[in-house]
């Protein structure tokens, strides 16, 4: 607080130092950006994925939590509550968001194929340990299967 004030919205020298250290430890990291929350990181990931791929659709694992942004609230629910967690979000916001069943690579593959005719898939969001904070674990090889698709 003494050095930079109460707002961390602007870059700070320590962000640069951290980015440099991460690049040294993980040479494949070409760019690095600090963000304020996981929600913000997921929102940025959607935007960067769409920019990088030129595609518009996002597919996410059903029941998985990826922050509170409107588009990623689809499929975020406590079992038995329908879409209670996404109340207040107009349905049109989910036009380019789909979900697939956890542990079901065939369901994901089907959605990827369909999206080839609907503007392509920009990104697939998963929780590698399983949805609902890993209370519904997925097979240990599931993330590799997603990556292969």
Language-model-derived ranges and their functions:
Residues 13-16, 59-64, 123:
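Beta-strand segments within the central parallel beta-sheet cores of soluble alpha/beta enzyme folds
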Residues 50-54, 74-82, 140-145:
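A glycine- and small-aliphatic-rich helix-loop capping segment at beta-alpha/alpha-beta transitions
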Residues 1-55:
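Glycine-rich loop-to-alpha-helix module at the N-terminal edge of alpha/beta enzyme cores
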Residues 7, 35, 61, 100, ...:
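Conserved residues at the C-terminal ends of beta-strands
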Residues 65-130, 137:
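PLP-dependent aminotransferase-class I/II
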Residues 118, 136-149:
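Catalytic PLP-binding core of fold-type I/II PLP enzymes
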Residues 51-73:
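Conserved PLP-anchoring active-site segment centered on the Schiff-base-forming lysine
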